[in-house]
Regions:
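C-terminal helix-rich "cap/oligomerization" subdomain common to oxidoreductases
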Residues: 32, 42-47, 91, 249-299
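Conserved acidic residues
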Residues: 17, 41, 134
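N-terminal Rossmann-like dinucleotide-binding module
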Residues: 1-27, 33, 248
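Rossmann-like dinucleotide-binding domain that binds NAD(P)(H)
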Residues: 141-210, 272, 276
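Beta-loop-alpha module in the N-terminal Rossmann-like domain of NAD(P)-dependent dehydrogenases
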Residues: 5, 23-85, 97, 105
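NAD(P)-dinucleotide binding in Rossmann-like oxidoreductases
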Residues: 182-187, 195-251, 255-258, 266-270
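A contiguous active-site-proximal alpha/beta segment in oxidoreductase catalytic domains
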Residues: 50, 73-144, 295
Length: 299
């Protein structure tokens, strides 16, 4: 994945002044940056997920803007810490959830259905209604692949869809109530989350006989289905390029702005969403894999 990022950034005119393929090389590279020998405009972290914590912390501490591959962390607690420290230190952290830039997602965001859905969620939240008027169902399956085997299926596949949900829905409407894991293994998860004003079902399988990337949304007797793996015009946009452009745009505005809690920029809201997605996915490990399914804390 790192080579793909490098190649596409270089096509946009970005020059890489340092590349690390091992932990030792990364350590040496950070030392050169800290000493002032190297003065990069930003860093890209596309290493195994278990190393993201270490590298993101270093970037935040140095206030070095960073694009980090998903997931930003495999710990809900660490994700919350990143969110706090990034805000406190005014450090730009951009998580590489390229699915946000899928053409199907971008087009759906422009539809009347999407705007009505977001309006209803806000209205129901303000009225303090505890109902499930809107239901999401995310399905993401594919055959066996040796990639990303350093993390379980929820951090490999399901995290994409949880991030999409967080980017679709205002956080006030996502007050967590309960979680039910219908099925859970290292390669397959079927989980249902109940929030205050919506229900979200996730099916992710990385050892499946079929390939699927769909989002189904039901509201007021109507429904829409998004096929994230198909493009009607026959000319699929390269989501990773759109992701890079969004990061570079954020980087440009970041250099000329001051961040505070009352005026968070779009890039910070995106980072908050990515961190919240990790927190919600982490509940599976905390509540089920550790045998604490009956200790759900709505906080």
């Amino acid at each position: 994945m790192g080579q793909r990022h490098k190649r596409l950034f270089e096509e946009d005119g970005v020059e890489f002044i340092g590349v690390a393929d091992t932990t030792a090389e990364a350590t040496a590279l950070f030392k050169r940056i800290k000493s002032g020998e190297l003065t990069p405009d930003f860093a890209v972290v596309a290493s195994p997920a278990v190393t993201h914590d270490e590298y993101v912390k270093k970037c935040i501490k140095m206030k070095l803007p960073v694009l980090v591959e998903k997931p930003v962390s495999i710990s809900g607690e660490d994700a919350l810490e990143y969110q706090k420290h990034a805000l406190k230190r005014n450090a730009l952290v951009f998580v590489g959830h390229s699915e946000r830039f899928n053409p199907a997602i971008e087009e759906f965001a422009k539809t009347d259905f999407c705007k009505e859905m977001q309006g209803c969620l806000k209205s129901w939240f303000l009225q303090k209604q505890d109902v499930f008027p809107i239901c999401f169902k995310f399905t993401r399956t594919h055959g066996f692949s040796p990639r990303n085997r350093d993390v379980s299926v929820e951090y490999d596949l399901m995290i994409h869809d949880m991030d999409l949900l967080c980017s679709f829905v205002d956080k006030n409407a996502m007050l967590y109530k309960s979680l039910d894991c219908v099925e859970l293994s290292d390669d397959r998860v079927h989980a249902i989350y109940d929030f205050r004003t919506l229900k979200a079902e996730f099916i992710a399988d990385r050892n499946s006989a079929s390939d699927a990337r769909t989002v189904e949304i039901s509201m007021k007797g109507r429904s829409v289905t998004l096929d994230l793996g198909a493009y009607r015009n026959g000319n699929p946009a390269y989501a990773l390029q759109h992701e890079h452009q969004a990061f570079l745009n954020y980087l440009s505005s970041y250099k000329n702005a001051a961040l505070d809690e009352d005026s968070a920029y779009d890039w910070y809201r995106d980072f908050y969403d990515a961190c919240y997605a990790v927190v919600l996915v982490a509940l599976i490990g905390e509540l089920y894999k550790k045998g604490r399914a009956n200790e759900i804390d709505a906080k």
